[in-house]
Regions:
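Conserved N-terminal glycine/acidic-rich loop preference
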Residues: 2, 32-42, 52, 147-162
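N-terminal Rossmann-fold NAD(P) dinucleotide-binding loop
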Residues: 3-8
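Glycine-rich phosphate-binding loop and adjoining beta1-alpha1-beta2 segment
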Residues: 13-51
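Catalytic or ion-translocation cores adjacent to nucleophile or general acid/base/metal-coordination motifs
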Residues: 16, 158-178, 186-189
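A structured beta-alpha segment of the ubiquitous adenosine-cofactor-binding alpha/beta core
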Residues: 44-71, 78-81, 100-106, 114, ...
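Short, solvent-exposed beta-strand-terminating loops
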Residues: 72-94
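Rossmann-like NAD(P)(H) cofactor-binding subdomain of soluble oxidoreductases
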Residues: 95-153, 158-164, 170
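Long, compositionally biased stretches enriched for glycine and/or charged residues
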Residues: 178-290
Length: 290
């Protein structure tokens, strides 16, 4: 529902996409489907004067009906949910000394996610090849690279992977470094593999390269005990560019940071082990209140 809100909210705010728009929601969970339906219908009324047609389909037996004739299919699922599967992804490796922060992209957690999600993706692909063979599959589900790679290599479905980290990358960097005055009118270039893109160029509204000033502020933030985004700032020092994905993700991508024999690195870079389960609990509680 969170991804549905973000992606479809953007669609409803883009005039070129709203003409003759039909949004079809599909889920195997009745209560989650109803939550998504209520949310999207409210966004449709608020931002689009109710012009879009919003439909909903429940259950595997209705999946082909939901997909039939689609031009775009947005995939945002979590097979096995937080409880039990995400908990298991963390607790079993931890038992054997393998620690993780997010565990949704690679490593033990990412592999387990892929193994339980690929069969569902294969079902989606078979149905799409039958009822909407020309549709573009927009994958928001992790592990991004593994799942998108599977769809591209082993199915006939046109697939693109998406992640919201690209949209929030430069804003988070500039705010973190105290450069809020450079936000308005900035232009940027981001490229790279999904879930590990790079901010290759960023300029202010006058076309001035912001990287020299960014680099001049990095060390002070790394030395600041209250600042948390330290892994990515170290990347700037070593590689010259800022990475789109969080420091928590990058601490897993690079084998340097999480080492049982070197716990001081966790402290130095403030790497939060078991971060994703904590986020899940907070998000679930926050969503209930919302």
């Amino acid at each position: 529902t969170v991804f549905a809100k973000n992606v479809l909210g953007d669609v409803l705010l883009t005039a070129a996409l709203t003409e003759n728009l039909t949004i079809t929601l599909y889920d195997i969970d009745a209560s989650r489907l109803e939550d998504s339906f209520i949310l999207i219908e409210r966004l449709n009324q608020k931002y689009n004067c109710g012009k879009a047609r919003v439909e909903k389909f429940l259950g595997v037996e209705n999946r082909k009906k939901a997909l039939r004739g689609a031009n775009f299919v947005v995939n945002a699922i979590q097979v096995g949910l937080y409880d039990p599967c995400t908990i298991i992804d963390f607790e079993i490796p931890k038992k054997y000394g393998l620690r993780q922060t997010i565990a949704d992209t690679l490593g033990i957690g990412g592999i387990m996610r892929a193994l339980r999600t690929i069969p569902v993706m294969a079902d989606f692909a078979r149905d799409m090849e039958e009822v909407c063979p020309d549709a573009l599959f927009l994958n928001y589900t992790n592990p991004m690279a593994m799942l998108s790679g599977y769809m591209q290599r082993y199915t006939g479905v046109k697939t693109v992977g998406l992640c919201h980290s690209v949209q929030v990358c430069s804003e988070g960097l500039l705010k973190g470094l105290g450069m809020e005055d450079k936000l308005e009118g900035r232009k940027e270039l981001i490229a790279g593999i999904n879930h590990m893109g790079w901010l290759l160029d960023i300029r202010d509204k006058h076309g001035v390269d912001l990287y020299p000033e960014i680099k001049s502020r990095v060390q002070a933030k790394i030395d600041d005990p209250k600042f948390l985004d330290k892994v990515r700032l170290q990347y700037i020092q070593h590689f010259g560019y800022y990475c789109t994905e969080s420091s928590e993700h990058n601490a897993e991508y690079n084998p340097y940071y999480i080492k049982t024999r070197y716990p001081e690195r966790l402290k130095a870079y403030q790497v939060p082990l078991d971060e994703y389960p904590r986020r899940c609990v907070e998000q679930i509680e926050g969503w209930k209140k919302e």
